[in-house]
Amino acid sequence: MEPVYSWGNTHLDFVDPEIYDLIEKEKHRQCRGIELIAAENFTSVAVMEALGSCLTNKYSEGMPGNRYYGGTEFIDEIESLCRSRSLEAFHCNPEKWGVNVQPYSGSPANFAAYTALLQPHDRIMGLDLPSGGHITHGYYSSGGKNISATSIYFENLPYKVDSKTGYIDYDKLEEKAMDFRPKLIICGGTSYPREWDYARFRAVADKVGAFLLCDMAHNSALVAAQEAADPFEYCDVVTTSTHKSLRGPRAGMIFYRKGPKPAKKGQPEGEVYDFDAKINSAVFPALQSGPHNNKIGALAVALKQVMAPSFKVYAKQVKANAACLASYLINKGYTLVTDGTDNHLILWDLRPLGLTGNKVEKVCELCYITLNRNAVFGDTSFLAPGGVRIGTPAMTSRGLVEKDFEKIGEFLHRAVTITLDIQEQYGKVMKDFNKGLVNNKEIDEIKADVEEFTYDFDMPGFFISESRND
């Protein structure tokens, strides 16, 4: 049998040089590029150490103190600490709120919450995908095809933004809800740049007798830092992923109300919330088996960092950087959905330029600027939508401030100008457009400028000098 030191204690670069080299290339890409995908961030070396720790070895079905495996003494302590830190980080009273930290990521957290609250074919209302919602909030394609499990197992009617302003049309939301009578209303999204009126959502939910769930995956850092409206004041359940603005590992959390319900007309006296058992059993055994203990340990570390005073400074800067970049692009004459932002992201409408998001995404990628194509209201194609989404958390984590985001705005302006020139010369068809990307000197110039620009900023998680590709 092969000795343990041989297979078990040999480093990656020797065991698998191919994977090691690809990781080094990805490390170089992250270091030398401008990361503007709103759903991405850079986590800390402390979180990475927990992710790569011996916690990955342990299996632990069940909840702390009630496991189906032995040897979970320290795993129980870690998960209990993670749960208590979750509540503290989001300013939740543990007598009124519980939390499950076992979901593998944000999408499983959402579906576990639906499984706990609903029966198959119950009705859901979430923000329409082209309006800024998420695919797990229920979405049908224009042909009526079910896109996600949410739309397969539940009946969905989306609410939308106003076509002129880009803001959520709360009056139409209420009108639809009164007709549709959903059992669950979802607030939260992936590309909505404005604040959420949770009080209005609560009022609508109460009118139709619906649960109210907030998916705060994108702006959870702003909520924790009290730089955004608080969904916990109005919602029954709050879900989130943990790797976006929160800067944690790829995991998920479900917060839920517990204890006595507030007095309400027509409600029996002394009634209590029953979410605790339903949500915990929906996560396990209904949808998952053993939790990923390395992620839970890493999340506990990230939450400790969230509670540090420096995290609030970071959250404030995320918003300031987004506002600065939005102002720069508007001053250049570009069109932003809602004419700006209240949070960490910008939705850039490229349709007035005659461009599609996939073309701008491709040119930016070649310039070492990473962003993503994104639907804007009225789009019918998600492969070639009319916009791009831009987020500020990742580069804020590297220490960039307003003046640096003005420089990023300049890079984006140059990239879009190149995109327009290529389209004019080669045409709108993508296979023809791609010909203009080959050996393009202007793209190479931006790429070189971007690499020089990013060189001065530290990289969370590792030292740039340690990369083999530098």
From Swiss-Prot:
Cofactor field: pyridoxal 5'-phosphate
Positions bearing N6-(pyridoxal phosphate)lysine: K244
Catalytic activity: (6R)-5,10-methylene-5,6,7,8-tetrahydrofolate + glycine + H2O = (6S)-5,6,7,8-tetrahydrofolate + L-serine
GO cellular component: cytosol
GO biological process: glycine biosynthetic process from serine; polar nucleus fusion; pollen development; tetrahydrofolate interconversion
Entry GO MF terms: glycine hydroxymethyltransferase activity; pyridoxal phosphate binding
Record keywords, A-Z: Cytoplasm, One-carbon metabolism, Pyridoxal phosphate, Transferase
Keyword flag Ribonucleoprotein: no
Keyword Cytoplasm appears in the UniProt entry: yes
InterPro entries: PyrdxlP-dep_Trfase, PyrdxlP-dep_Trfase_major, PyrdxlP-dep_Trfase_small, Ser_HO-MeTrfase, Ser_HO-MeTrfase-like, Ser_HO-MeTrfase_PLP_BS, SHMT-like_dom
Pathway membership, UniProt: One-carbon metabolism; tetrahydrofolate interconversion
Localization: Cytoplasm
EC number: 2.1.2.1
Pfam families: SHMT (PF00464)
Record Gene3D superfamilies: Aspartate Aminotransferase, domain 1, Type I PLP-dependent aspartate aminotransferase-like (Major domain)
SUPFAM superfamilies: PLP-dependent transferases
The protein's assembly and partners: Homotetramer.
Function, in words: Catalyzes the interconversion of serine and glycine.
Family the UniProt entry places it in: Belongs to the SHMT family.
Name the record gives this protein: Serine hydroxymethyltransferase 5
Origin species: Arabidopsis thaliana
